[in-house]
Amino acid sequence: MPTLFSGAKIAVLCDGRLLTYLRDDLPTIPWPGLWDLPGGGREDAETPLQCALRETREEFGVSLDPAWIVWERAYAGQGMNGLDTWFYVAEVPVGTFDQVVFGDEGQRWMVSSVEAFLAMPDAIPHLQQRLRDFLSAHP
């Protein structure tokens, strides 16, 4: 696994439903006002998985078990400064979404069907594609 990466995102799935949030609508942030998945930028010397899990805790108040990760992939050179980004998929137990305590980033959160997220015109396009990559590898 490369030691340099810019960040990680994670699709948190439960019975075909997906945890999402609407980003703040600020011109100073990437992808303002679009639907997003948990995750964000690397801090200190954390691994990509540690980054994704920490961001999920910070943004949604949910601690994910690393054993729930069912897929991971590095996307070379697609992050800040040309660094890699990582994308994870976690299949979580029923009831996990009931534990959400939404943090202070974003306007609101929502659980949607995977199909609805993939069809959203106002979702971050490369995250929709990464979720499609997972689905094509796990039909």
Task: Label every model-predicted segment.
Residues 1, 26-31, 92, 120, ...:
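Intrinsic-disorder/low-complexity coil detector
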Residues 1-36, 64:
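N-terminal strand-loop-strand
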Residues 7-10, 89, 115, 136:
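Residue-level detector of intrinsically disordered, flexible termini
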Residues 13, 27, 46, 58-61, ...:
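General helical structural elements
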Residues 26, 30-32, 37, 70, ...:
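Residue-level signal for pocket-adjacent positions within structured domains
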Residues 40-66, 73-127:
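Unchanged
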Residues 126-139:
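Charged phosphate-binding loop/patch that engages nucleotide di/tri-phosphates or the phosphate backbone
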